[in-house]
Amino acid sequence: MEGKRNGQTRLAYVLGVPLADNCVRQWPQMQELVQGRELIGSVEGNFEAVTLEVGRRLRLGDVVVVEWSINYGDDRIYRNVTIGELEHGEAVRVTDYWGEPVNTPEWRVEMTARLEMPPDGVWPSKDRLKHY
């Protein structure tokens, strides 16, 4: 396994802090809730081909906000935002939001500018993602 791990889960690496035993992970897109560090690790274990990398991590008191990229092994790069709520330095509640990049709708092309996404920026490119 390449890359450095910070704890027993990929989520702990993404957040940069350990998970509390009773950590709750929320996925609003699917109306799902994963309860407990051990179960979070078990769910992650079903995605062996995953590579990921953090682009930016902001700590605001007892809140961590992380922008990161993930490839589930099918070369579709999802861009994510994860919000972790901390108690005593451990994540107790985490909410993940993600989306697969899509093309700009034709009607909007003339109204917007292209967002520059350098490979080593906030949204790491596919070649910078690692197994954790």
Which residues are covered by each model-predicted region?
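C-terminal and inter-domain tail/linker signature
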Residues: M1-Y132
